[in-house]
UniProtKB/Swiss-Prot annotation:
Species per Swiss-Prot/TrEMBL record: Ehrlichia canis (strain Jake)
Description of how the protein assembles with itself and partners: Homodimer. The tRNA molecule binds across the dimer.
Protein name, per record: Serine--tRNA ligase
Ranges in coiled-coil conformation: none
HAMAP family the record matches: Ser_tRNA_synth_type1
CDD domains in alphabetical order: SerRS_core
Length: 423
């Protein structure tokens, strides 16, 4: 949600920001709708004041034993007008409807561009392995070892699902524990276990609704299956006013995530790269405005640390204005090297949403400024650290051996009963 006062003060800047995010100019329309709403509110307050005066007059006349039929009739007429204006305000949702579908304003340092071709590489880490044999895909390796079954999954649920067996099922669990241990024991995140069914209001709070209603699974009673733990974790502070001394709040969770992948027809149709259901470890931070920028850098470092421990080559990209998510003001993607595709693929996305989500959730913090207590909207950040399915892909492909076995990364072996190989 946007600050209308900011738009009124900076209409050209706001339009420039929206155009950079591939949206049309809307500042003038927002200003006009806001003026219309305020005119109605002014009329409403004036009528309420007039009715209160007449009410006091009626009470005095009754006390004095004087007839007050004229005043009573006037009060009824004013009440009807008040009801009419209240109905007009309720029905006139154009301003809110428009604000609900406009993305966040990009940070000043975000590169301008229409799509991923304008994303900027920040740094690389690790070395790509030179194979002396023909590299296999993760699904070729998994199916050959009889540890990955797409056919049986399709019988159960359709396309874009997978069944992991034995050592790969164990690897899936091991990765979750490995990541959560890093986040909680070394970086101070609090682990949360949360529902995977949420109210639509929670989806609205983080910006998933109303614009992306077709991207998530809807159940009866207006529940949604979470597309990411970000939804649940961020909404834990919905409606709260937090003491600034209690910030930052850092939360982490591993949960199944569910996505319709409505716009992904023909993309990554084989394997685990793009699934309707997958496990992911998520990081969420609730911070003050002053903590916001440094918290994003810290979050990216936490996600990078997982890949460093697994000794997987990766790069960090800053997304351009046209490629960022709806609620993000600035986003860093971490992309891991996938040998069979000879390219980097996204494995983590870390975003600073600034006060965009907090305005939708009405989440504030209290601070002292010039000896005066002030409430401000909190800043929220989220990041995947990491998507477990894609981490499995990266391990299988980067650690594959000529005989089709997979060497288990050293950092994971204590989570895998000290096994050295998947075979």
């Amino acid at each position: 949600m946007h600050d209308v006062d900011f738009i009124k003060r900076n209409p050209e800047l706001f339009d420039y920001a929206m155009q950079n995010r591939n949206y049309e100019k809307v500042a003038q329309k927002i200003i006009e709708l806001d003026i219309k709403k305020k005119q109605l509110l002014t009329q409403l307050y004036s009528l309420q004041k007039e009715r209160n005066q007449i009410t006091r007059e009626i009470e005095k006349l009754k006390k004095d034993g004087v007839k007050c039929d004229t005043q009573i009739e006037s009060s009824k007429n004013i009440t009807e007008k008040i009801n009419d204006i209240n109905n007009m305000i309720k029905e006139d949702s154009q301003l809110i409807d428009l604000l609900n579908v406009l993305p966040n304003v990009p940070d000043d340092i975000v590169p301008v561009g229409k799509d991923e071709s304008s994303n900027v590489e920040i740094r690389k880490h690790g070395y790509k392995r030179n194979f002396d044999f023909q590299v296999k895909t993760h699904y070729e390796l998994g199916e050959k070892l009889n540890l990955m079954d797409f056919k049986q999954a399709a019988k159960l649920s359709g396309s874009r699902f997978v069944i992991l067996k034995n050592q790969l099922a164990q690897l899936d669990r091991a990765l979750a524990n490995f990541m959560l241990d890093i986040h909680t024991k070394e970086f101070g995140y609090s682990e949360i276990s949360h529902p995977i069914l949420v109210h639509e209001s929670a989806m609205y709070g983080v910006g998933q609704l109303p614009k992306f209603a077709d991207d998530s699974f809807k159940t009866t009673e207006n529940f949604r299956l979470v597309p990411t733990s970000e939804v649940a974790l961020t909404n834990l502070v919905s409606g709260m006013n937090i003491n600034s001394c209690d910030l930052p709040i850092r939360l982490t969770a591993c949960s199944p995530c569910f996505r319709l992948e409505a716009g992904s027809a023909g993309k990554d149709t084989r394997g685990m790269m793009r699934q309707h259901q997958f496990n992911k470890v998520e990081l969420v931070s609730i911070v003050t405005e002053e903590q916001s920028a440094s918290e994003l850098e810290r979050m990216v470092q936490v996600a990078e640390e997982v890949l460093k421990r697994l000794e997987l080559p990766y790069r960090v990209m800053m997304l351009c204005t046209g490629d960022m998510g709806f609620s993000a003001s600035i986003t860093y993607d971490i992309e891991v090297w996938v040998p069979s595709q000879n390219r980097y693929r996204e494995i983590s996305s870390c975003s600073n949403c600034k006060d965009f989500q907090a305005r939708r959730m009405n989440t504030k913090y209290t601070t002292i400024t010039n000896n005066v207590k002030v409430s401000k909207f909190a800043h929220t950040l989220n990041g995947s650290a990491l998507a477990i399915g894609r981490t499995i892909i990266a391990i299988l492909e980067n650690y594959q051996n000529m005989d089709g076995s997979i060497t288990i990364p050293l950092a994971l072996r204590k989570y895998m009963n000290d096994q050295e190989f998947i075979k």
